[in-house]
Amino acid sequence: MNNSTNSDMSTDLSGPPQVVEHVMTEPDLTYQFGGRYPIAEVRPGQVLRTSTEDCFSGAVRTVDDLPSEVCQQFNPVTGPFLVPGAEPGDTLALHFVEIRPARDWGMSATFPHFGALTATHTTAMLHPPLPEIVWRYDIDTTAGVVRFQARRSTYTVELPLDPMLGTVGVAPAGGEVRASIVPDTHGGNLDTPELRAGTTLYLPVHVPGAMFSLGDGHARQGHGEVCGVAVETAMHVTVAVDVIKGVPTPCPRIETDHQLIAIGAARPLEDAYRISQRDLITWTAQLTGLDLVDAYQLVSQAGRAAPGNVCDPNYTMHAAIDTTALHGATGYHGTHQRLRDLAGRLRTDLCGAAAGTLR
């Protein structure tokens, strides 16, 4: 068996969790990955508690607040956070312990020239662009729902609350700076609904310290984010951090208790699909010892695929497989389970100093 995505150089996570509290303020927000000094340091094995803004920087609060009029930039992230000891060729592991709405409301919108079903600057059409319309959702954390209210009728419906982060990434390689809205191998605006609490995200380390940032909270999002905007809201986030030394990761990956997920980002959409499928097949072969062609066949029959977004500068696709099809194999020498165990030892008041309700 080829365990090239496993490592014996694991951080000792057996002791009491060490928590780093970082209360987010406006200067902590950035709209890029790379090219920025760290705002704080989080060591491998520590747990970060912080907050994030929504993609509108909190400026869209009512259905009358048009983003084109009240927003100067979009998609801020909190960071970057420096991880000492992380070096190019390593893998950064981020286990999301809690992703909790910081407001009791969220916002969504349609934009002219943005979204999967409208003309854009690269998809030229003769028809008029879609109108700019804003929807406000009530978020009920007690009931675990968000409430949709149609703008052009009295139709309402409650949808399950499913908090996630749309944008998480590290500094790109080669000194490059990428806008936070762009997903790629460094992570970024992945918009993958599976990036919820209880999952571990693996990212390649391109620069010393990794320099990770996170944000773009969604109270829920459908696969594909077809109109381009989820139920956007600020979040309180608790994340456990580790570094897998000497083990590279080609593109973002997610591990849950029951599945492995590879994420591809590209245009056209079929290339994002191919990237995600190739990585999942390669990962499957490494974890099981299967020949690549046998792994290809196994993933063809046991795998699943879904879009993350079909509206950003790069599209995202994810390829997933249940670990039961891999005889229970886990990635990165059990890092997900180790971080999950660490999270379980945290005290129950996960809010800590970063808690409260954002205005």
What are these model-predicted stretches?
Residues 8-69:
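N-terminal, Lys/Arg-enriched amphipathic/low-complexity engagement segments
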Residues 23-33, 70-78, 178-186:
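Short, structured beta-strand/loop micro-motifs enriched in basic residues and often containing a Trp
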Residues 42, 83-86, 195:
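Short, well-ordered loop/turn sites that connect or cap secondary structure elements
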Residues 50, 91-94, 203:
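A generic structural signal for residues embedded in beta-strands
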Residues 55-66, 99-109, 209-219, 308-310:
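Short, Lys/Arg- and Gly-enriched loop/turn segments at beta-strand edges
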Residues 101-196:
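Intrinsically disordered, low-complexity linker/loop segments enriched in Gly/Pro
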Residues 161-270, 281:
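Conserved mixed alpha/beta catalytic, RNA-binding, or beta-rich assembly cores of soluble enzyme
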